[in-house]
Amino acid sequence: MTARKILISLIVGTGATVLVAFIFQGVIDEPATAEGLVKPTAGEYDPAVLGTYFPQQYKSYQKNLEMAPSPTGFGGSENVQKSLKEPEILTNFKGMPFSKDYSEDRGHPYSLQDLKASKRVTPASLGACMTCKTASISNIYREKRWGYASMPLAELFLEAKHPISCANCHDPATLKLRVGNPAFLEAMQRRGIDVDKASRSDMRSYVCGQCHAEYFFEPKTKRVVFPWDKGYLAEQMYAYYAEKPFGFEQDWNHPDSQAKMLKAQHPDFETWAGGVHGRSGVACADCHMPSLSESGRNYTSHWITSPMRQVQASCKTCHKQGEDWLLERVKAVQNNVWQLQQTAGKTVARAHEVIGKAAAVEKADKAELEKARELVRKAQWFWDMVAAQNGMGFHNPDQVLNTLGRSIDMAHQAIATANKAATTHF
């Protein structure tokens, strides 16, 4: 066999592996400085300063300032109130701050600005709320450890000089990917995972998962905790909460049903992990921060947005169907999830109302009422584990639809149990 034939055989035999490695790992971890300039001063946190060394990355990061609806009609980067399309939110979160202000998220550069403007923030709000809102969090944690979590939020605004930006995901000293959220590191350690030994591909999801995840505040210290000890599924996290970890039992008491409720927070990482992309080793950044080329230079886009805004770069590196077909496929999945999500949310809202009416009946069976409250607590948790996500279920459609179906079933059980308690039909 000639040398040329041997070379061709090697290329054919290993081509897929080489291609995937090139597409997904080529440039994201160690960005090259502009025109070979020296690296910035170690410890620099200002994205504008770092942007002078990485102009293409910074230019794309600036696109996160744009506000526009999603190409699929779901999500988007305009901070419109969700209750305008989902009025059931006002019932389901009655008695807690999300009934006052629950909007779609704008881009990362707005993180501090939107936190300050949120109607959920009051003079009593604590520093734990800053954990995923500033690039300064690793410095704050280094100086104060978890003590910052119980500080007044207003004080931390003085130390949080930059919104979510470079230093949340890159070590300012080495520019390598790193996780800055201590809650994520602690959760992974409890799961037996050493983040310091993570692969490049894993890190490209970990830097996103450190904030796009469910969490709660430890009652005494206000430390941020991720409820992953039993797993990432809604059922597993619910079982974890049932054990009242660190004394945590509930986020609030619903004023209608008197159920002890939980509020889910953007569990995107958990949902992605069990989906086809997560199980296939496709990282968050592969789709949401694709590799681009400009003036002959490859760089990673830092416009963290829907892959449907740049289908060619985000999707067609793996998928060979046309852009229109891919967009319609995503729309179809999201439409199915949206319809079932609305049914679940409205059924949960009705359950709260029925339990409240049943409890007002003088001779209502208290034991049955408690069963109904537990059912609506769990039904709403399952609904919220989908409703609180970004992506309208696309990260794991099978799991999401199953979760919503179970939510609807439990909400109907809650209604039936409440009616049984009151020996009537509301």
Tell what function each PLM region has.
Residues 122-140, 145:
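A cross-kingdom signal targeting lumenal/periplasmic-facing segments of multi-pass membrane
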Residues 5-25:
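Hydrophobic membrane-insertion alpha-helices, especially the h-region
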Residues 104-126, 158:
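Long, charge-dense tracts
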Residues 23-106, 142-286, 290-418:
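Primarily the internal scaffold of c-type cytochrome electron-transfer domains
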Residues 1-2:
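N-terminal secretory signal peptides that target proteins for export/translocation
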Residues 417-426:
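Long amphipathic alpha-helical segments
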